[in-house]
A protein has these predicted regions:
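Bacterial N-terminal signal peptides
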Residues: 1-8
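Non-catalytic structural scaffold of enzyme domains
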Residues: 13-409
Length: 409
């Protein structure tokens, strides 16, 4: 490994024994020295929140998909904040800094290798990059940096980060800078459901895929949230892919009923990108209007105000609520804008650590040691090769606004 320490991440890891013992060593060491450069950056970051950006951090697909939703989101009245569309983008005038973690994703590999501590650490490091005001000018120039905005809100785009990093970030934020908003998709969906569906008495269902469910993400988030919301409980199911929306909805309700559930569901949290809650809600409304026989069999399981909720819906609501509370809207008369940054491998490491495509080999990526003085990735502005064909196809199909801005001629 090459000996490189980014100024953003410069922490000397030792056994100081400070802070929350449930956090990772990297975080405990940040909290143990309140005079350190890193701690000071956190404490002083984005003092004037109005000028700050909204960062979205995580794997490229999830990050760009969320950003695309926020570009045209119109769920609120921009004057009084009521949940009524007003024909104006909810995030008018705001800038989204998209930190696509190309170097380190996908994240499930860390869990397969039993290296969840490193996943938590890189989540914290990406958070630090989002609130910092510098990024590297080039992957091939480790010394030259350029300026960017610090972020007033940091959104984690992947559910994996809800379980592997969010708690550690919040340990830092609560100690050093409580007025920075950090939003986790899983925590945000649960909060939204609790706030908007009190009739459910904290009982909800989760629609996700087998890999996400098997990772323990929801069990981890629930164990944290139940301390605050004592009645919170959930059941998770994985409807089959490849069927029509109607069939998938019926499949979900069938799974819920098949284990003997009789209590009504107030909301279903949908964590199965690129599936959107509004599409499911529209299909469910059509089924009701058409008196669908299959739905009639399960309608007794749904409260009168039942709805599907996805990360984009819940996160947008939490962002708007925070900005109204802190009075940190930019008040610029403009459409929302985006800037894309990416994590990339540093140069100069052993040749066998790089894949033919220029990233890390899987063996190297998923077996890196936590709390090391050797930094292996850096943040740069969107490089030329960032959008490969697979990502372009994903954007063309699922994130048309981002596609038009960065891909379409």
């Amino acid at each position: 490994m090459l000996s490189i320490v980014s100024p953003t991440f410069m922490v000397s890891c030792g056994n100081h024994g400070a802070g929350d013992p449930s956090t990772i060593p990297f975080v405990r060491d940040i909290l143990s020295d309140t005079t350190s450069t890193v701690y000071e950056k956190i404490r002083k970051s984005c003092i004037d929140g109005r000028d700050g950006s909204i960062a979205i951090v995580g794997p490229s697909e999830q990050t760009l998909f969320l950003a695309d939703n926020f570009m045209t989101c119109d769920d609120f009245d921009n004057v009084n904040g009521r949940c009524i569309p007003d024909g104006l983008p909810d995030f008018a005038g705001e800038t989204f800094d998209l930190i696509c973690d190309s170097a380190n994703a996908p994240y499930e590999g860390y869990l397969k290798q039993g290296n969840d501590v490193f996943l938590k650490e890189l989540t914290v490091k990406n958070f630090l990059s989002s609130i910092d005001t510098v990024f590297h000018a080039s992957q091939f120039d480790k010394n030259t940096t350029e300026r960017k905005s610090a972020s007033k809100i940091v959104i984690l785009s992947s559910s994996y980060l809800s379980a592997f990093g969010y708690h550690d970030i919040m340990s830092i934020v609560n100690a050093a800078r409580p007025d920075i908003a950090v939003i986790s998709p899983v925590h945000s969906m649960f909060r939204y459901a609790i706030q908007h569906h009190p009739e459910a008495n904290g009982s909800f269902a989760v629609w996700t895929d087998e890999q996400t469910l098997g990772s323990g993400i929801y069990a981890t988030a629930w164990s944290e949230m139940v301390k605050e919301y004592k009645t919170l409980k959930y059941e998770a199911y994985c409807p089959q892919h490849g069927k029509s929306l109607r069939d998938r909805i019926i499949s979900f309700f069938r799974m819920y009923k098949s284990i003997g559930n009789t209590h009504k569901i107030g909301a279903v949290l949908v964590d199965d990108m690129p599936l959107k809650a509004d599409v499911l809600n529209e299909e469910l409304a059509r089924m009701r209007e058409n008196n669908d026989d299959s739905l009639t069999f399960y309608s007794g399981l749904l409260t009168d105000r039942f709805e599907f909720i996805d990360p984009a819906t819940a996160i947008a609501s939490e962002c708007i609520s925070f900005m109204r509370k802190e009075n940190c809207f930019t008040h610029r008369v403009a459409y929302p804008s985006t800037r894309i940054y990416c994590t990339v491998p540093v140069t100069g490491m052993a040749a066998q650590d790089y894949s033919p495509q220029g990233g890390f080999t899987e063996d190297f990526k998923y077996n890196r040691a936590d709390c090391s003085d050797f930094e292996t990735f850096m943040l740069v502005e969107k490089p030329t090769r960032f959008l490969d064909e697979n990502l372009k196809q994903f954007l063309r199909k699922n994130a048309q606004n981002i596609y038009n801005e960065y891909v379409s001629d």
